[in-house]
Amino acid sequence: MTFVEMNPAHLPLALLLEADPAASRIAAYLPGAWGFAALADNEVVGACVAGLVGEQTAEIFNIAVAPNRQQQGIGSGLLRFVLENLAEKGIGRVELGTGSFGHQLTYYQRHGFRVHAVVKDHFLIHYPEPLMEHGIQDKDMLRRSLALAPDIATP
């Protein structure tokens, strides 16, 4: 598995839609963002889009792994690569938003992210179709953050 930084416009839309089902929202955060990919035999099997949202703060807008490649450590490897790259760019804090239940709760906690806010009704307001997971509609967004240590970037 190879991890690379790449133009976010070259990341497969179908893969980004795995994490964010609103193509219009994806199109809105791609310009000016950083793109990262996990490559297997030169095929993008994991993708991440992050962007600057404050002086030393970045947000991970999207991170996804192809469904047939999940549960193989690709997402965790990609996330580590992204965090290292953001630290090298001088980013001191990384934020992201997730649903309020599901696998992402433990996933991001394992990587050190902590909940710092709840945005009530976010998915009801910003998505035209209900977002469902395990038969339950996601309504609220959990805002999570991680402080990057200056030494997270490996030489």
Predicted features along the sequence, with ranges:
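Conserved N-terminal entry element of GNAT/NAT acetyltransferase domains
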Residues: 1-8, 142, 147-155
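Acetyl-CoA-dependent GNAT
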Residues: 2-66, 79
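Short hydrophobic/aromatic beta-strand or adjacent loop that forms the aromatic wall/cage
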Residues: 33, 138-143
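Short hydrophobic clusters on alpha-helical segments that form packing/core surfaces
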Residues: 60, 82-86, 104
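A short, internal acetyl-CoA/4′-phosphopantetheine-binding micro-motif in the GNAT/acyltransferase core
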Residues: 63-71, 99
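Conserved acetyl-CoA-binding loop-helix of GNAT-fold acetyltransferases
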Residues: 71-84, 110
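Conserved GNAT acetyl-CoA-binding A-motif
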Residues: 86-99
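Conserved catalytic-core motifs of GNAT/GCN5-like acyltransferases
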Residues: 95-97, 109, 114-137
